[in-house]
Every structure is written in structure tokens, then in C-alpha cells.
Amino acid sequence: MYAEERAYGSFDDVMEVYQQIVTESIQLKRLHFGSGCLIEFLGDSGTCETFCGGWISMICWTSDTNSMGSLTVDIGIDDGKYKTYNARGFLLCSKSITSISQNTEGRDRILTVSQENNKLQITFVTLTKVFKEHDIRNLGDPKCIEKFEKECRALDRKKHDDEHRKRSGKQKEKRKVEDTDKKKDDDRRKQEERKRNDEDKQPDKKEESDELPKEKRQKYHDMKRNLEEQSHEDGITLTSTTLVNGAVEGALPPCISIDNHEDQQHDELDKRAYAQGTNREGLSNEDNYGNFRLNKSLEQLRAKLVASSGDIVERSLLKLKECLDNVKDNLIKNECADVTGPSKCLSKTKHIEPKKQIVFSDCVRPVPVCEIKPFIDVRLFETARSPRRLRQRTRTIVGSTDGAIEQQRVISGQNRGRARGRGRGRAPRRRNSNINNSRTQTTIVIDDSSEAENFENEGSFNEDLLATTILETL
């Protein structure tokens, strides 16, 4: 490196005329000085000049992105002379010093301005790269200077071209990267579109597979119908088994009520049958044949159960009729005994009419009549107010399954004439016996409701008879 140009300036009595900030990056300043001195060197020779007065103008530009900038210093003299120094490059600024350095291939420049205490100092240096010794020797020759300047220009152009190539290369690389990114994006979009198209086509395939041929659809329809019939049979057998379980010997026939609960059961069975039919579509022929045999055996078993349940119900009804006949005979015998005896105290019964039907279903527990526990209320002996003869009537009503079997027997005093024909000596004894019989009264209630049977009998004979009849009915 070789210092080709040097310039040093010193100015006194410096005054700032104005300062203008055009933008944040451009500033303008104007100064006046009273006296000054400027020394310049070019190669090995130099000159010195003094000034009595003049002005100095400074223009500074700074970049917004980095520390690059430019600085221009113009010096005007009253005699009509002027000097200019400029440089562009890295800019350094402080409160009193502003410096800029320019770096180019073959030539570097440094320009510094310092202002302090009404004094201004300017320094300007140009550095040049020299490759041969004769260039150094002949540096003061104007021809050599022109040659040197040409070389510097060529170097500057070369540098500019290199920078342009680098920039273009970087741009090409960026374009390649962008192109690859675009290709990747296009590939992704195509793949997504293919997936969407495949997903849109899948439901169509499913619908095609769901559509069965006519033969398969007919088989499926027949299978579904058989399963529905089977489900209805299952519902019938369930009700029959409840009847068999609820039947008790000596009980009245149950009264079945078809309610919403059974309808719900049939709906559930239909749903299960439909689900079984849909699940059986994929079974093989062997499985279908095995299921057919199993269903056939189940149907036979259900038929047997229905027949056996009917037999059991008939047997229970026959036993119930026999028990009712026995009760009827016993009541007739008791009435005959009361009529032939000396006392005319008659028994009196009320007919019990069933107000509520007993419902046998899955949700309601069957409660036959025989399960209603009777209880005997034996009241204290009460004295009768009048010794008159008690006239009583007996009315028995017996209900069966086919209808209410009613039997009414009215026993009146048939032996009144015979009683009148007897001697009068026995009349007091009979009166006493009637009084004693009226005093001993027992009330037997056979139901937990308000309906009751009041039996008024004589002595211990009628009480034992009633107890035996109650046990037989139970």
C-alpha cells in the first residue's frame, strides 16, 4: 500500500451558521471561518495555501440498515478558489468527530472532520496498491497516474462483476430452493386430492357390497321371517311357564291380562331376532343346517311344555272343584244337623264377590286366593238383650272357573208344629238353651278385605266343623 494523496487543513474562528436535518439519514451543516491553512501532497511533492476567510459545507448521509454512509466536504475561499473531498464507506460518528473509510480494490480513502473549541481540522488520505517498483518511482508522472487510474477502474469493474455474479448465484440458488419447495407442495396437494378421491369412492363400494343378489335377499327374508315367528313362540312359552309356576292346587284359575309390558317384550324379542338375522348372514351352510335342527328340537320341547302346562292347569281346576264340592256337602250336613236339633240357631253366611282380578305376568307376582291367610277372631261372650228366638238364614255362594256357582239355601223353622205339640214343661229348658246359644257366638273372617263371613253356631260342635272346612279349602 502506498499513500498517494494527502491533505491536511486547519481553520480558526469557526462559527456554525446553520444545521439542517433533512431526514433521519441526511444532515446538512454550514460553517464560517476567519483564517485557515491547507497543505496537499501528491506523491513526493506538495503545496501549502493560507486563507483569510471563507466557508465550509458538510453533507452527511447514513444508511438505515447498516453503518454504511457517505461524507462530502466543500471548502470555498473568498478569492474564488474551492476544494472538495468526499468518501463513502463505513461511517463513524461521535460528538465532535466524524470519520468515514472507503475500501475498494487498489485504492482506499479516509476522510475525517474534527470540530472542537471554535477550531476545525480536516484530514484526507488516499492509499493505493502498487505492484511494481517503477510505478512507485514514476508515480509523479501524469502518464503513470492515468495508467494507474485505468487499472483501478478495471479492478473496480471486476469487483463489481464478481459481486453481481455472487448475487446472481445466490438468487439462482434461492430460485432452485423455491422451485423444489413448490414441487414438494404440489406433490403434497396431489396426494391429498388422491386420498380424498379414494375416501369418496369407498362409500360407493360399500353400498355396492350391501346390495345382495335376488337369491341371497330371498334367503335372508325367509330367515328373518322364521326368526320373527320363533320370537313370537318364545313369548308364548314364557307366558305359559309363568302360568305353570303360578298354578297352585286348590287355587282359582288365574286371569291373564295383556298389558304394555308384554308388548315391550315382543318388541325386544323382534329386535333380538333381527340382530341375530343380520349376524347370521355370514354363516356357512353347515351352521345354518345345525341351527335349523336346533330350532326344530326347541319347537318340539316348547310344544311339550305347553301340553304339560295345560294338563297341570286342568288338574288344579279339577282338584279345586272337588274341594268346593266337599265344602258344599259339609255345609249341607251342618244345616241338616241344625234343623233336626232342639235349638233353632241357624248359621248365616255372606257371599264374597271378587272385586279385583289377580294378574299373572312377569312384572306382577301371582297371588292366588288360597295364599290369603285367614284369621279367626273369637270375641267375648256377650249377653243377649232379649230371650227371643233367633231366626237365621244360610246363604252360600260358591264361585268356579267357568262362572259363579251359586247355591242358596234358606232354612226356616220347619219343625215349629212339632215344637208346639210338646209339653209345656220343656219350654223353660228350651228358652234357657236358646239364651245360652245366643251368648256363645263366634265370628270367623276369611279375607283381609272388608268382606267377611260371620258364622254364628252353637257350642263347640260348630266351631270344630268350621275349622275343618277351612283347613280343607287351604
Curated annotation (Swiss-Prot):
Coiled coil: none annotated. InterPro entries: U79_P34. Keywords: Host nucleus. Transmembrane segments: none annotated. Pfam families: U79_P34. Residues 417-432 have a biased composition (Basic residues). It is found in: Host nucleus. Residues 156-165, 175-219 have a biased composition (Basic and acidic residues). The keyword DNA-binding does not apply. The keyword Lipid metabolism does not apply. May be involved in DNA replication. This is Protein U79/U80. It comes from Human herpesvirus 6A (strain Uganda-1102) (HHV-6 variant A). The gene is U79/U80.
